[in-house]
Amino acid sequence: MNVGKKSEIQVSAKSNLNFLNELIEEKKRYEDEKRKISHQKYTDKLLEANDNETTKRKLLVKQKRKSNKEFQSNIIKKRKDEERKGTLKTEQANEEELLQRSRLELERKAKKYDQYAAGELEIKETEDDGILVDFTRKWAEEAPENETVEITDEFGRTRSVSIYETGNTLLSQKEEYKPEKPIYGDYMPSFEVDEEKVQKLWKEDEQQAVHYDSTKEVRNKGTAFYQFSFDEKEREEQLLSLKEIHAKVTQQQRKNTEDVLTLRDKKLEERRKFLERDYAIKLGERWMSEHFSNN
């Protein structure tokens, strides 16, 4: 046996064929996988491109609609501005035309009046009515047909009557009025004041002034503000009702306070008992440790 030579591996032809078949199948599998991955990537790119295209198309449609709305609104606004400007121009033109005609007419009349004043022209009878102003006729034309005034009749009522009826109404009142006790000559009337009546009136005023009236003041009222009635009977009923409500609220508050204090005392007592028991246990343990640990 020659040790220096390398040993060769004997491989059969069948094994080579099997290996080649497996290699070809593996290569084919690899190519198929690669082709599937490439196809999937290509499909994803196409879908992404379609999505982007759809999004772009939607954005373009949205922008186009927005621009169309803005364009239409601008057209409507521009049309309204033009109509308003045209209306203003027409009104200004009409006013200017009216002013121009009035100015020309006044200038013509002024020139004609100057000629009449200088004696260059004579006033004809046919022109008399058109030149001179008839102030009587002007006042009659401007005055209302049936002007009314306010008067107070014999019953104390304020009435609106025609100006032509005012004289008769006031005249009848003047004739009907006759004083009961006329005073003639140098005479100073005296008046005796009834003290009892005055005192009674003062007491009534003071009694009424005791009660506060919130309607006489202009100010902001609080949430719990309460206006009592000025009727004494109703006022007493309101006071009694408020006193009953106050008593109920006070009793409920006192009860709640007592319940809270009772609960607090109960908790303090339980805590005290717990501490005493705990202290007794610790004291017993310490006594036991001191006496039995030495033994």
From Swiss-Prot:
Stretches the record annotates as Disordered: 57-94
GO biological process: lncRNA processing; nuclear mRNA surveillance of spliceosomal pre-mRNA splicing
Pfam families membership: DUF4078
Disulfide bond in keyword set: no
InterPro entries: CCDC174-like
Localization (cell): Nucleus
Top-level taxonomic group: Eukaryota
GO CC terms in record: nucleus
Keyword annotations of the record: Coiled coil, Nucleus
Sequence ranges of Basic residues compositional bias: 57-67
Subcellular location, principal: nucleus
This protein's name: Uncharacterized protein C140.04
Coiled coil as UniProt keyword: yes
Coiled-coil stretches noted in the UniProt entry, renumbered to this chain: 87-116, 259-286
Annotated organism of origin: Schizosaccharomyces pombe (strain 972 / ATCC 24843)
Regions of compositional bias (Basic and acidic residues) in chain numbering: 79-88
